[in-house]
Amino acid sequence: MAGMKEIRGKIKSVQNTRKITKAMEMVAASKMRRAQERMRAARPYADKVRAIAAHMSRANPEYRHPFMVANEGAKTAGIILVTTDKGLCGGLNTNVLRASVQKFKELEEKGQKVEATAIGGKGLGFLNRFGAKVLSQVVHLGDTPHLDKLIGAVKTQLDLYSEGKLSAVYLAYTRFINTMKQEAVIEQLLPLSSEHFEADDGTPATSWDYIYEPDAQAVVDELLVRYVEALVYQAVAENMASEQSARMVAMKAASDNAKTVISELQLVYNKSRQAAITKELSEIVGGAAAV
């Protein structure tokens, strides 16, 4: 009977765990829809800023913004690492962290040091354990990304690049493909090249000019900063949509596994109970026969 009591305890424990994972699955599904809506809402703005930046960068060849000039003499590269603040989202963070480690090694082989900005608690913890130099950080963003919370940390990298202290700035995050698929990517944020201004189908942007007020340099300077900020915001929005999707899938898998374990434990319990009843009946029959 002690064995049966232990099995009942295990069944109860797994049932309680399944209730938790089922609730988390439902919460993640709700948050996922909102995160996807925010991500899709941010895309038109990012696309429009991309188009304007393309026109302006091609229309003013006499002026080159610092973001469009390679700092070939710099021996340090920057990376902005976007991860989640919470876990229980499958291999989402593991994949982007693994890709980041590979990028770190590639840069070090080229004689480049790496200085990082962490967006998300998981990435910050990883960078500290990895021994990387963390220039700035943003954690506890919540379920809704706000640009004003990101600007300070991102500006640290932008300023260093403008001063010629960084050879390049990379952006590592998880791109949302669909509910079942997310992809860890590392993109070069700076220096900007013509590839940054191509359309999604790979077609280069057309060249035509604007009338600038007060002058072209002032407008280009402001716009390219906004352009980079838009890229970072879009990356964070994509990462949040990926997080909720991955968490929903992970919790669904956990709930399904818990259901399977409960069924298996219930079968073991029934067999044990049947064996105990059979044993008791045998003892009763044997005792009656002896009498």
Curated annotation (Swiss-Prot):
Name of the protein this chain belongs to: ATP synthase gamma chain
Alphabetical list of InterPro entries matching this protein: ATP_synth_F1_ATPase_gsu, ATP_synth_F1_gsu, ATP_synth_F1_gsu_CS
Protein family: Belongs to the ATPase gamma chain family.
Cellular component GO terms held in the UniProt record: plasma membrane; proton-transporting ATP synthase complex
Known function: Produces ATP from ADP in the presence of a proton gradient across the membrane. The gamma chain is believed to be important in regulating ATPase activity and the flow of protons through the CF(0) complex.
Matches recorded under PANTHER family: ATP SYNTHASE GAMMA CHAIN, ATP SYNTHASE SUBUNIT GAMMA, MITOCHONDRIAL
NCBIfam families: ATPsyn_F1gamma, PRK05621.1-1
Summary of subunit composition and partner proteins: F-type ATPases have 2 components, CF(1) - the catalytic core - and CF(0) - the membrane proton channel. CF(1) has five subunits: alpha(3), beta(3), gamma(1), delta(1), epsilon(1). CF(0) has three main subunits: a, b and c.
Superkingdom as given in the UniProt entry: Bacteria
GO biological process terms, semicolon-separated: proton motive force-driven plasma membrane ATP synthesis
Main subcellular location of this protein, as a coarse class: membrane
Gene Ontology molecular-function annotations: ATP binding; proton-transporting ATP synthase activity, rotational mechanism
Keywords associated with the record: ATP synthesis, Cell inner membrane, Cell membrane, CF(1), Hydrogen ion transport, Ion transport, Membrane, Transport
Topological type in the membrane: Peripheral membrane protein
Location of this chain's protein in the cell: Cell inner membrane
